[in-house]
From Swiss-Prot:
Keyword terms of this UniProt record: Activator, DNA-binding, Transcription, Transcription regulation, Virion
Lineage: Viruses, Varidnaviria, Bamfordvirae, Nucleocytoviricota, Pokkesviricetes
Assembly and oligomerization: Heterodimer of a 70 kDa and a 82 kDa subunit. Part of the early transcription complex composed of ETF, RAP94/OPG109, and the DNA-directed RNA polymerase.
Family listed: Belongs to the poxviridae VETF large subunit family.
KW DNA repair (keyword) present: no
Any GO molecular function: DNA binding
Protein name per the record: Early transcription factor 82 kDa subunit
Gene source species: Variola virus
Stated role: Acts with RNA polymerase to initiate transcription from early gene promoters. Is recruited by the RPO-associated protein of 94 kDa RAP94/OPG109 to form the early transcription complex, which also contains the core RNA polymerase. ETF heterodimer binds to early gene promoters.
Domain of life: Viruses
GO process terms (BP): positive regulation of DNA-templated transcription
Compartment annotation: Virion
């Protein structure tokens, strides 16, 4: 998809706020008659032919920088006031009413700020209209000011316009990953979103649900509730969860849909804050080792790592790679990831158009000093030589070997060999971490022959290494695990599941050397990421997936012992991962994965019962395993436009005490969630005599529910 840089509009107004000049700013040579800016000009201002100016307001400017730029653009030397009809710019009222210098009121406190344009004008990437008035023409001339233009901004803009025609802005935004936002979207807002989905008639499935303190679920579109937990879920046409909100947070997988739904309705949502990461794929490669040759602090801040940039407010981080850019922002700003990608591509065209080769000798302090270092007893740093010894055998075009020496020749024809005075580290190999990240072949000295390693095959024989090959390094538990990684289990489960199993690690690091079998954590197979945000989500997932799930120090089982599958899942940062057994031979980097020993956890399953009817009528049967209609389990989500009231039933002390032994063991579900179920509520509604509660429980859950009775 080709990114189109949106036009911008600058309006200079006179004493009566009449438009004196209308400047249509664009990097293109024409007016986009389909753009919202042109529609606004024609329909609202009745201006058919604005001044077309080949310039561009950088959205990264502060208000003072913007004011200096606009004074230069309009050639105004007087004090000016800048404002907009859509958002507050340099001035705002304390209640966030839109400021207009021609309609000033002293009844509200006026605040001045010098924030960044894209922060105060969230829609600026798509629609930017700025009004400029001479301060003396307004009712508050004392609020005006004059700012000198930053010549570096003008210089950068000139270079930007010069290179713009040659920019390849074909990009694809692949993912929005950290998509849980903090908000305060309450009942009114949730119901308005539901109504908006229904009004749009877009065939998206929507569900408004609630659950009380007894975790009895109710679903529907209309409720009368008092401070009880709500959840709104909307699914895409393909069944993928597009957004979900519990009122305090909102998970957004489809940002465009969410923006469209709330753009013109009052959801009474005061804030929406959170992190979101975009991965933008580029049609044309860039130089990731970016170097800025002029002052550009009004756009980016350079970091110590030459492929990482920060926005001027340090709230947006940009990681550059050859074929893609990762952009992490603190708050959702529509299309900001595309705009920053445009700036990065432009800067590459300005300053980094020639792709330079990464000569290993020029980055010696980065790689050798940190990774492949010499110590008292280890000499792992390769040395550079000028010639090959006679009689060396050619292994490949860049690798030679003799009985005494191995030599690697990099792309710059520099020869590396290992000459350990102690005679130990004399085998040339390569650092996996840099090869995995950048395909750099960084030589290092090893104790043993490295020719069996996949990285060696890639660097020496140019054999493509499978992209999803798993690194033998095992991460500490707690980080999200990608396809090429694995991590340890939490300490308590590592000790339990790996009792009697061993994993030999290389000295001084967490690189797996050899194991005949060891339980670890892997990402789940397949392309779909499963997020579980609430206890309700966890229970639903376990019962539908029918496998064991570890969450923190708890183990969740499906409701029925007969349903338990052979997989073990584990939740890390709300993302479902998989527990597997890893096996590896010392002589190879190849890693094999096998199913876990699920029986270790299954044997701890605390509730084993046979299916027992509780009450039946007209083909409907309530059992200890669920509610059945004509023999079929009823598990449909209900959607109703009727108001429903339920009376909560308090679980008696006798019931809680009866089930208390269960909770000395691994917990299948939360205590209240297990005791206060439909079964308990209905049993009590059946007018069971309080004196007979224990006998009734023994009928349906004998022996505290731990032993199955045949």
């Amino acid at each position: 998809m080709r990114y189109i840089v949106s036009p911008q509009l600058v309006l200079q107004v006179g004493k009566g706020q009449e438009v004196e000049r209308a400047l249509y700013l664009t990097p293109y040579d024409y007016i986009d008659e389909k753009s919202p800016i042109y529609y606004f000009l024609r329909s609202h201002l009745n201006i058919q032919q604005p001044e077309i100016v080949k310039r561009h307001i950088l959205l990264t400017l502060r208000m003072t920088q913007l004011k200096g730029y606009l004074g230069n653009l309009l050639d105004i030397k007087d004090d000016i006031i800048i404002y907009s009809h859509k958002n507050n710019l340099e001035y705002s009222y304390v209640d966030n009413t839109i400021f207009n210098p021609f309609v000033y009121t002293q009844k509200k406190t006026l605040l001045k700020n010098d924030s960044f344009l894209y922060n105060v004008y969230p829609g600026a990437c798509d629609f930017l209209v700025i009004w400029v008035a001479r301060a003396c023409d307004t009712s508050i001339p004392e609020f005006g000011s004059y700012e000198d233009v930053d010549n570096n901004i003008i210089k950068f803009e000139t270079m930007l316009m010069d290179v713009f025609p040659q920019l390849d802005l074909d990009i694809t935004v692949e993912s929005k990953f950290n998509n849980i936002f903090r908000t305060n979207l309450k009942l009114t807002g949730l119901k308005k979103i539901i109504q908006r989905v229904q009004d749009l008639d877009i065939n998206y499935k929507s569900l408004l649900s609630r659950y009380d303190e007894h975790f009895i679920n109710m679903t529907g579109n209309h409720f009368i509730l008092n401070d009880e937990q709500l959840n709104l879920s909307i699914w895409d046409l393909d069944g993928t969860l597009a957004l979900s909100s519990d009122g305090d947070t909102v998970m957004i997988n489809n940002v465009k849909l969410f923006t469209d739904l709330v753009s013109d309705i009052d959801t009474q949502m005061e804030r929406i804050k959170g992190d979101i990461t975009y991965k933008v794929h580029l049609a044309t490669p860039i130089n990731s080792r970016i170097k800025l040759d002029i002052e550009t602090s009004f756009i980016f801040i350079e970091t110590a790592t030459n492929n990482i940039l920060l926005s001027s407010d340090k709230k947006i981080s940009i990681i550059l790679a050859k074929n893609h850019i990762s952009i992490k922002v603190k708050n959702h700003i529509p299309n900001i990831e595309k705009y920053f990608t445009f700036l990065v591509i432009a800067i590459n065209a300005m300053f980094n158009s020639v792709q330079k080769s990464a000569d290993f000798t020029k980055v010696e302090t980065v790689y050798w000093s940190r990774i492949c270092q010499n110590t008292k007893n280890k000499n792992r740093k390769p040395v550079i030589i000028n010639y090959l010894d006679p009689g060396m055998k050619k292994i490949s075009n860049n690798f030679y070997r003799s009985d005494e020496k191995e030599v690697f020749i990099n792309d710059n024809d520099i020869m590396f060999t290992c000459m350990d005075p102690l005679g130990k580290y004399n085998k040339v190999g390569f650092l996996n971490i840099f090869h995995d990240m950048r395909k750099y072949c960084i030589p290092c000295c090893f104790l043993h022959d490295q020719s069996h390693r996949s990285t060696f095959s890639s660097c020496v024989h140019q054999i493509d290494v499978e992209k999803k090959i798993v690194s033998p390094y095992i991460l500490n538990f707690g980080k999200v695990v990608t396809e090429s990684k694995m991590s340890f289990l939490p300490i308590i489960f590592d000790a339990f599941l790996n009792d009697g199993m061993t994993a030999n690690m290389e000295q001084d690091n967490k690189r797996l050397k050899e194991t005949s079998g060891y339980h670890i954590v892997r990402c789940c197979t397949g392309n779909d990421i499963v997020r579980l945000r609430t206890t309700s989500n966890i229970i639903q997932f376990v019962n539908e997936d029918k496998n064991i799930l570890i969450v923190n120090d708890m183990v969740y089982f499906p409701m029925n012992a007969s349903d338990i599958g052979k997989k073990i899942h584990i939740l890390i940062q709300e993302i479902v991962h998989e527990v597997m057994i890893v096996k590896k031979k010392e002589s190879s980097d190849k890693i094999d994965f096998f199913p876990p020993n699920y029986k270790l956890l299954k044997d701890l399953f605390p509730k084993q019962t046979i299916q027992t009817p509780i009450q039946s009528d007209a083909g409907m049967v309530l059992t200890t395993d669920g509610f059945y209609i004509d023999g079929k389990l009823f598990n449909e989500d209900l959607s109703s436009k009727y108001v429903t009231f339920t009376k909560n039933v308090i679980t008696s002390d006798a019931v809680a005490k009866y089930f208390s032994p269960l909770f000395k063991y691994v917990i299948s579900e939360a205590k209240d969630r297990f005791i206060k179920t439909w079964m308990i509520n209905i049993m009590i509604h059946m007018n069971v005599d309080p004196n007979n509660i224990i006998p009734t429980l023994e009928k349906y859950y004998p022996n505290f529910g731990r032993v199955q009775i045949n």
